[in-house]
Amino acid sequence: LAKDNEVIDPQLRTAMEMAPSATQWPNNDYARVLDIGDITIKPDGTVVGTYREIFKLFNERARRLAEVSIPYNASYQSVRVIQARTIKPDGKIMGLRGTDMRNTSMFNDYPLYDDTMSLGFSMPGVEDGCLIDYTFQEITRPVLMPGEFWQYWTFDGTDPVMLSRFTVHIPSDKAIHYQVFNDPNLHPKITLSSDGKVRNYVFEERNLKPIVIEPAMPGMNEVKKWLEISSMDTWQQIAAWYWALSKPEAVPDDSLRSEVNQLIAGKTSEPEKAAAIYAFVADKVRYVGLEFGLSAFRPHSATEVLQNLYGDCKDKATLLITMLNVAGIRAWPALLESGDNSLIHNQLPTLSSFNHCIAVAFVDNSEVWLDATSASCAYGDIPVSDRGAEAMVIRDGVGQFEMIPEYTPDQSGLDSVVNVQLNGNGGANIETSATMLGAESQQWRETARNLTPDQRLQLMQQWAQSVSTGATLQKWSLPDGSVGNGNFSIQMSLSAPHLAKTTVHFMLIPAAIGLNDSNAHNPFVQDTRVWPIVVSNPMTEHSVTTINLPSGYEIEELPPDVSLSTALFEYRRTTVESPDKRKLVISVTSISKNGVIPPALYTQVKDYYNAILHANGDLIIMKKTG
């Protein structure tokens, strides 16, 4: 640590002068006053980066910033703190002591990943209105792709930014590519050193407002201002490099072959074999949740992963690919950025573009995407966070970008059947069944597999209450969530003593009975909208509710049918009386389609949801006979 912690250098003085007050940003917990990155590219490709952060903390919620953690990979990086201090509101400066720092492995329990480290420290004397100021250096040695380099920088975020500056110093004889996103007016200032040996690029943004966060908004890469630089010319350089890393690790031994033979014994078709192997890797090999690249980039050998029964995304993909190949099924690695549907091929070629590794197999002449990190995904399904992403599939060293298919509305959602037997006092016996598909199936399977028996019962009891207040379970069925087919089905029988309200002459029963819940509230409550509405998880929810009338009552009034639509959403409800007038069948269908809705149509979408909520309050009125 620097010994001049109490010296107010020019950068700190500037930060103190332009630091805003809490009243200027009442909806923010802090401001990023100074955000500086300065990197030097050495002739051998070594990257020496110096980073300085100065934050103004407005309130107690901002104190989380006092706990600083700097992740790095010890196999090719080193990190040291140059200076760290807190400037209190009265101007007093409290410096961090060297003994207050801690260097720890982020995954101590997993020896395969002990190179994934974190340098952490706690800023002293933090209180409302203080500044925290720390500077650290990160050195990245050129061991991954010798001679190549890449960097990534974000200028804004959900907090106000007073000054964000990113500077690159590079030998003048080295080529560099840069690309700025979401700010056409940002251009670097480029200069040469006095001796002409170093070229300097300075990118700077000032006085950036916080990014407005809204439900169903575009991904952050689509709205934030960010920059990437790279020395690489084509994506094929990365494809060839990763293939050379991963192919030697996808070699089976006798133990792995034996495991595959046991898994596929008695199975004759390729889909059966692929499903059995996928289920084993997804369910039996523990997933260590490291982003691609945090623990180096070379996967561990498939045999080692099988022996240890744990691995990160690239390890599980390598094991899956190796086992499929042993079974005679071709499979390859696919790199992607999970949770981001940006078109990666339009970006510069960098390893920072990927945070996940999965597999794609060729089964019975069809392409099948397989993400073995998600035990909640059945064979043939793929996590919602992967869908719509552009993945680079690497076949025999050649990379090709392919879109992971998004769900269509009929592939995801909920299909429910409800049978209601009313009695004369307003109570009812209710039989329900629900089948979840796609994303809904994944969510329920993930929930179910993590519950104890008592928790499973509690979940079903809560669901019974959502159908009718005061309802009690009679019997129920909830699968354990293990990897199986793509659907997830639940059955439930319950007694609902207060389903309907009764008066001297009438019985009132809600028209909305059942298990559809996506329309139970309006997700769009703000008066105005900044960003487009992105529907990335299309689905269809369909329910059929049959109400058997009690003796001594007849239908007095039925609610009107409902038909609503706007942009990418549709809602329909019909109520049909049986010929003998002893049954009602209520059918509800709700459809959302994938796409983008411009902000100009926001009011229509908001009104659409409000209209559904209003319709949910409709009543069926029955009158006593005789």
Regions found by a protein language model. Give the residues of each.
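A sensor for short, sequence-defined functional sites
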Residues: 2-626
